[in-house]
Amino acid sequence: MPPRQPPPEIDPATRWLWLALSLITLWRLGAAWLLPITQDEAYYLDWASRLDWGYFDHPPGVALLAIGSWLAPASALAGRLGNLLAATLTLWVLIQFYRACGLSPRQQFLVLVVTAATFGGLVSGVLATPDTPLALAWALALHEALVALRGDRRRWVTAGLATGLGLLGKYGMALIGPVFLWAILWADPKALRTPWPYLGALAALLVFAPNLLWNVQNDWLALRFQFGHGFSTTTGVADVATGAVMALPERVSPLAGSGLGERLMAVLSFLGIQSALWGGMILPLLVGLWLSLWRRFPDSSQSPDHAPACDSMNHAVSSGHLDRPARALLVAGTLFPLCFFALVAAFSPVQPNWAILYLLTAVPLLAPVMGRVPRAMLIAALFNLLLVSVYVFHARTGLLPLPDKQQRILYETHGFEALAGEVANLPGPLFADRYQLVAMTRFYAPGLEIGQWPGLFRPSEYLRGRLRPEVDPTAVARAGGFWLLSRDPYRPGIPGFGIEGQRLLYDCLREGLREAFPDRPAPCAAPLHRWWLVRYVPDPAP
């Protein structure tokens, strides 16, 4: 018998790659266990109790990933398990995509670590948000599109399937369409003469169809809300589908009437925030970019006519082993989300996470640049990881003496468990003015009969009669009135009811939840929250 061939030796960089993936996953698991639930997460986890093809704010992807809450309804870790699985799968798909792009094992290792260590990667890998299913579908769509651009045009169908799944996670997945078109025109324009890209679009539409049908049945509720939210426009939700209590308030952009200078500053602010998502890694990245340019043009006396800046930048970011399809997809996937939301930022406020998917393609595109300073990039990545780890620890303990502006995580998470225990014993119907208070108290007290009183603040899924029964003021009056939980001292007038009394609760960092009384000193000097419990009773009959 011929001698058995020894198995091929595994590149040490490949071992480091899979070790990095394992360590990243373990860190995310620990952070998900340590970090208390945040307000929007509690809202999404509540959706999982009533799965549907759509919700007031988003399509159903985030609710589906939250079904771990069925195992332990008051556990943040259980509620995040689906998110953790999807986030880990996203990194695995990205490894396959980066390998297909032509990156070496060393580059794959560096790019994986940097991608996961951006602030976007660290946060989205832990928190249960719609961005997680969106990122997974985006990565899958990029992988399939690359194969299609290289000649197997049938893969536009699978890219379309991934796009449809992404649309079921978050409507921002629609931006992949222009990215694909840009890449096709650059790398394979003849594909537009074949049926495959169009079959891919049809596949996306078919997968997305259940949510479209849900929107049709609910007067385009979620799409109208998101369009108004994204572009600061008044979309109006028809009373036919949702009732008058669901009519959305008029939206006016703070940039309305602004001059060119203010709009330009808004765009620059948006781009600055996107750069800040790199955290400490932005500094070695700039050094690597400078070294790339300096190596390209070491002679400072060279005429600009022979070394245009655009050519030097193109060489700096694309001198790796990227073929035309890979380069087209990476450039389009990076520039289109940034350019699109930069344009939106000139007219309407843009949240930092809306364009965050540009990082999935920007990082491998900049692999040659980062390769000039790999140790510095890894050290900066560890710095980001340490910074977020300390912040997660602070969210759990509140031990760090941070200024008020840096205490947002405590405002998001602290005291709600005690609040839920307090309001669970109140007699009579209970409502809150904001959906966040409803979600947090229902998370910590599963089954708590609390709803959102309509017309006071932004409407939510709680007013649709799915998660909670629709509010019937007549039935509430027959019950003798209700309690209203609010974080505002303002007492809204509610037709048919008057105020009988109120209680004030202080959420103190060290002392916990304490009730305040007019004739006694305040329970603490700087509470994280003040919550009012206002008792409304029916107006006396005429």
Give the residues covered by each predicted segment:
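Membrane-proximal, lumen/periplasm-facing interface regions of secretory-pathway glyco-
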Residues: Q351-P352, A376-L426, Y435-G451, G455-G465, ...
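Membrane-interface transmembrane helices that cradle and orient dolichyl/undecaprenyl
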Residues: E9, R99-P105, A141-W156, S319
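Transmembrane-helix motifs of polytopic, lipid-linked glycan transferases
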Residues: W18, L81-L103, A117, L140, ...
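Short acidic/glycine- and proline-prone juxtamembrane loop motifs at membrane-interface regions
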Residues: G120-L134
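Short helix- or helix-capping micro-motifs
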Residues: L21, Q108-F119, H143, T163, ...
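Transmembrane-lumen/periplasm boundary regions of multi-pass, lipid-linked membrane glycan transferases
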Residues: I176-F297, L322-P325, P337-C339
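Hydrophobic/aromatic-rich transmembrane helices and adjacent perimembrane loops
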Residues: L51, G280, L335-L338, F347-R375
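Transmembrane alpha-helix segments characteristic
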Residues: L19-T25, T163, L285-L286, W294-Q302, ...
